[in-house]
Amino acid sequence: MEFSTQTTASLHQIKTAALAVGVFADGVLSAAAEVIDRASHGAVAAVVKSEFRGRTGSTLVLRSLAGVSAQRVVLVGLGKQAEYNARAHASAEQAFAAACVAAQVGEGVSTLAGVAIEGVPVRARARSAAIAAGAAAYHYDATFGKANRDARPRLKKIVQVVDRAASAQAQLGLREGAAIAHGMELTRTLGNLPGNVCTPAYLGNTAKKLAREFKSLKVEVLERKQVEALGMGSFLSVARGSEEPLRFIVLRHAGKPAKKDKAGPVVLVGKGITFDAGGISLKPAATMDEMKYDMCGAASVLGTFRALAELELPLDVVGLIAACENLPSGKANKPGDVVTSMSGQTIEILNTDAEGRLVLCDALTYAERFKPAAVIDIATLTGACVVALGNVNSGLFSKDDALADALLAASRQSLDPAWRLPLDDAYQDQLKSNFADIANIGGPPAGAVTAACFLSRFTKAYPWAHLDIAGTAWRGGKDKGATGRPVPLLMQYLLDQAG
């Protein structure tokens, strides 16, 4: 989608298929709504008084208003004026874009980013507007036998009306938001594809395709023999249960940092289990189809790299993806098996459905060779995190306060929330094994914490954080689908690091 800015006081003269103006819940019109109200001789105020309550994200379409050039004026609810904030703005922008999609219009004009929010500059508002519009316009039809082309959104362009003095910052924010939206689109589509299409090889080919599209990206895709040579015994033990060949994907964004005394790269590590049946510790059948989403950590890394490359962000970033399936077979891991990780630590596999940590631990060891400034792994790791935090916050674990604080700040600014959970050494006792250096599960109590504790055993060489996105990477039920999270959080963190 294309985004741009326009500066004009003559809103009523703008020729467009849809013009968005904000209305607060207490009946107060935004400045833009007042302009349209005057031009239409009080039509907006009359409608607001009689039938539009201005609830956050609600919309009402007014067609062919006298004195207004726009074909449609879309009243968008902003909620209570005293409570108007960044999240309410994002909801309003998404509601407007959704109204444009529903009306099958090709372009629209929004005045919503021009509504001031204390502590939220226009650049951040514009960025949020583009992300929200991208989310509203997302449409999946990749695996339909005969895609309904009429159902595809026609919305291709949104113009934000802002003050002339704010135009440059708004354009910067729109550019950032568009790149993030494109990254989220890729992440969502990869997640939504079925496991027989989005295989480890498919993820590897997607990475190669990105490298062909963007000059800043370099990609290397390792196969079984190369992984064996590296000694990734833990990763290999999971992969051998499936006929689908594994892939270990290494991406590099060479962003030419401005700092002369540059630190090492930021490394993003994604869990890429393209289908997780649980292995011999088989999952229940009822919702097993959703285990195609067990590669959403990998998908978020690829989406983040797409956004990074589009923005040409001046930062060195490495992406590592360990991709395979976790299936039961005669070659699959068995409960009680002991495997040797790339680090040399041995692992007793008490539950084969705790496989994500088995592939991540070798990727985290591989990350040491880059002498990273920080490593962040992203994984749909535990159902326990969903129990603890539901579908709102991603779980954040780190012993590095500076890294954790930076990620939490990014989560707040990007409206992609995370919540820090404990990583105390006392939990490590639950991972003791009588037959290996470490067990791969720690029993029912604090399952998300002990999973993070397991990973921490392989991260002693660098600052590290773990994002458990099991509750936030996709939605179930009638609205089933990938969300694209935590691409906004990751990109905001990287934007902050780039300065």
Curated annotation (Swiss-Prot):
It is found in: Cytoplasm. The keyword Metal-binding applies. Its EC number is 3.4.11.1, 3.4.11.10. It holds the Pfam family Peptidase_M17. Its cofactor is Mn(2+). It is an enzyme of class 3 (hydrolase). Mn(2+) 1 binds at residues 276, 353, 355. GO terms for molecular function: manganese ion binding; metalloaminopeptidase activity. Binds 2 manganese ions per subunit. Mn(2+) 2 binds at residues 271, 276, 294, 355. This is Probable cytosol aminopeptidase. It comes from the Bacteria. It catalyses: Release of an N-terminal amino acid, Xaa-|-Yaa-, in which Xaa is preferably Leu, but may be other amino acids including Pro although not Arg or Lys, and Yaa may be Pro. Amino acid amides and methyl esters are also readily hydrolyzed, but rates on arylamides are exceedingly low; Release of an N-terminal amino acid, preferentially leucine, but not glutamic or aspartic acids. GO terms for cellular component: cytoplasm. The keyword Hydrolase applies.
